[in-house]
Amino acid sequence: MSLSEKGRTYVLFAIVVLACAFGSLTQTVMNSMLGGVEADFGVNASVGQWLTTIYMLVLGITVPAVTFLSQRLSLRNVVFLALGLFLVGGIVDVLAPTFGVLVFGRVLQAVGAGITLPVLQSIAMTRFPKGQNGTAMGIAGIAMGFAPNIGPLIGGALVDSWGWRSFFWLFIAIVVLLILAAFLLIAREDAPMRDARFEGVSFLYSALGFGGLLLAFSNAASLGVQSPLVWVPAVVGIACLVFFVARQKRIEHPLISMRIFESSHFRISFIAQNCLFASFMGITLIVPLYVQGLCGGSAVEAGIAFIPATILAVVVNPLAGILSDKVGARPVVIVAAALLTVGAVSMAFMDENTPLWMTTLMQTVRGMGVSALIGPLNSWGMSGLPREIMMDASAFFAAVRQACASLGTAIMVLVITSLSATAQSGAMNMSFAYQAAFGISAVLAACVLIVVIAKVR
């Protein structure tokens, strides 16, 4: 690889890392901004929650189609498409006169984020030399680990100081800079398969499958598992995903090649990372609820709990990737999973008297484990795959990961809601509701530790 080719690869990678980071950030930033949005538009919490629900739904639906886009368009144009959707979505949201318009802007942003997630992982695994994949994936992990952690902090600070629209002004400015950088610095290239055909039936199954599950998990937190709005989309989602997988195995040109599961590395990484994200994404919502709802803190104080882990993630993510390239993935992911488990188990013992510094310390230990796991586990899992199905693996994994993150969050919120009602009757201490939710995260973290010790070689 010549110096100029290296430079183009690094520039492309940097732009997509930043784009993906902002896509991930916009998913969690709304957790701290919902109160302000609901007050401005006069909607209740159940309606306001659609700002986060619709984002997850559209993100999960979009991701599987990225394989087709990567075949039909050049990588440069795929990046422009994602950034363009970010920009238009941000403009719609900052000017939104009604709640419905605000939701539409979130839909556009979610489509952009759904495009960047698998593209980022594919670049890390296919555009870098074999000995640098772990490092590249570690840097990519900043977008998946650092950005969601900082979302509640940014959202809380902005909504307390300048209102929720200020975030979208900041978002627009950064996206404009990324578009200019992409236009000036990303090299033009031909699309790999100009005659690629879109497999519409497979996409329909995928959209109904992932969309149904995400909708079911989101509704479960507020409606309970007995509601038809939970079990009907869940049944439809599971059935459609079964049809989707069966069709991918049968047709000549699948939307997502199921050959990805022929790799034992990918199967193991797939299981471990889905447990990781179910544990990780739920906590980004539960910690703000705990600090504000149980301990009486402000939105800024809730965000403070994420600051050290967020700062350390910038160092830990690439460092873990570098170490995995040098000494192998196994020692790195075992230490990382141990940190994750220790932090998660410790958080299960927090109550209303736990000081903010202690909450921050435990969240920092847990966050370091997450940061050190994402990159090495990703690169190890994809290392045994043929180059031509890397995008398939990235897209399918990103979609399933989103569903698992939503499931973990829904279960934790459902536990808090159910046990809080019991606590209000005087039957138990309110802190037990949050301890039970943190306990679920701890169990998932322990599952990750068991899998990496037993299977990652």
Where in this protein do the model-derived segments appear?
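Flexible interhelical linker loops that connect adjacent transmembrane helices
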Residues: 2-3, 7, 131, 179-207, ...
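12-transmembrane solute porter fold
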Residues: 8-25, 30-34, 41-67, 71-79, ...
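Hydrophobic, membrane-facing alpha-helical anchors
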Residues: 59, 119-121, 125, 177-191, ...
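Alpha-helical transmembrane segments of multipass membrane proteins
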Residues: 91-92, 157, 211, 215, ...
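Membrane-interface helix caps and helix-loop-helix hairpins in membrane proteins
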Residues: 99, 192-194, 220-226, 353
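Cytoplasmic helix-loop-helix junction between adjacent transmembrane helices
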Residues: 108-142
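Helix-loop-helix hairpin linking two adjacent transmembrane segments in secondary transporters
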Residues: 140-180, 198-234
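C-terminal membrane-cytosol helix-exit motif in multi-pass small-molecule transporters
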Residues: 172-191, 207-219, 235-250, 448-456
